[in-house]
A protein has these predicted regions:
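Extended, well-ordered protein cores
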Residues: 1-105, 114-319
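Conserved small/polar residues in nucleotide/adenosyl-binding loops
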Residues: 321-323
Length: 324
């Protein structure tokens, strides 16, 4: 049961993320695009070429600031500790297989900040990346000398002791939300949390109010709105309120679902630009080292079919349809 005094909440960036920085253009004619990066010294590198687009196709570009992400995450670790609630991260590391493991790595580094400040170089030299989660780091400690490995273990223990409790995937086995990038997927984890009164499992195998960290604000808002409603009016009961089917736009690698080959982790500061075959700049962003930049394509036909499908399903089921 939900109560008005629940401390559960969603934390999202709201600025300097994919949603905030998005630019888009609808192509007036078929074309072939190029994605270029120009560094601060004026050197240009082609990131992607031969990008074929059709008339009416929507192309968008955006980026998430690594610096803003790190500041946001540090604040959320502090907030969860101060409020006495679980710290949890909710991403799409399976579907968004290029960007989200990197974001997950930032989350791991934020929680275990002192670990990476002290042993980050040694871990990197041993091929142990935060992007793969805490389990991969703990499993690779044999690649370090005994003294360093023991220091890493101590730093991990200290982070747990001094930081907020972390939501668990398996309390009995000590597997946290930060162990494996793909263990907690937002589409499944957030509805599950909401169904359990906004709580997740802690290390003592008890449910506890939770801070759900969803860095990109593109889809964080809907979960906060549901949480606010449940706090005010109680848990949802589908048997009395019904359901709303979701019709997503995914066909022909639409939107972010086709962004994998157009996602880049920036090595340096500069400008990323999307240009047409005439060399004209359609989209551009000023980026810094570590920023995550991506482009998406959405063809005209899938958009039309998507809306048509939603209308058809709504008529057939006599229900509301949510399109996203």
């Amino acid at each position: 049961e939900w109560t008005p005094d629940s401390k559960t909440a969603v934390a999202t960036m709201g600025a300097d993320d994919f949603r905030a920085n998005e630019q888009s253009v609808t192509l007036p004619a078929a074309d072939v695009l190029t994605i270029e990066f120009t560094d601060e010294d004026g050197k240009t590198t082609v990131l992607k070429e031969g990008l074929k687009v059709l008339k009416g196709e929507v192309v968008d570009g955006t980026f998430m600031s690594a610096k803003a992400l790190d500041a946001f995450l540090a604040e959320q670790v502090k907030r969860a500790k101060e409020e006495g609630i679980l710290f949890s991260a909710h991403l799409k590391a399976t579907m968004m297989k290029v960007s989200d493991p990197v974001i997950f790595g930032h989350v791991v580094k934020a929680y275990f900040s002192e670990l990476f400040e002290k042993y980050g170089e040694q871990l990197a030299a041993a091929g142990l990346s935060a992007n793969n989660g805490l389990a991969a780091i703990e499993g690779g400690l044999d690649k370090l000398d005994a003294e360093t490995a023991e220091g890493v273990r101590a730093a991990i223990a200290a982070a747990y002791e001094n930081g907020p409790d972390v939501a668990m995937v398996n309390s009995a086995k000590g597997i946290t939300n930060l162990h494996v990038p793909s263990d907690v997927i937002v589409d499944a984890s957030m509805p599950a949390m909401i169904r359990t009164s906004g709580r997740m499992w802690n290390k003592d195998d008890q449910t506890q109010d939770t801070l759900a960290v969803i860095p990109d604000s593109s889809y964080a808002g809907v979960y906060q709105a549901v949480i606010d409603d449940c706090k005010a009016n109680g848990a949802y009961d589908p048997t009395t309120m019904g359901t709303v089917p979701n019709v997503g736009l995914m066909a022909q690698k639409a939107e972010e679902y086709g962004s994998h080959d157009k996602t880049f982790i920036m090595d340096a500061a500069g400008t990323v630009a999307v240009k047409n075959s005439a060399g004209e700049t359609l989209l551009s962003h000023e980026v810094e080292a570590g920023d995550i930049w991506r482009a998406c394509q959405t063809k005209d036909v899938p958009v039309r079919d998507w809306v048509k499908l939603a209308v058809t399903r709504a008529r057939a089921s006599l229900s509301l349809i949510h399109i996203s």
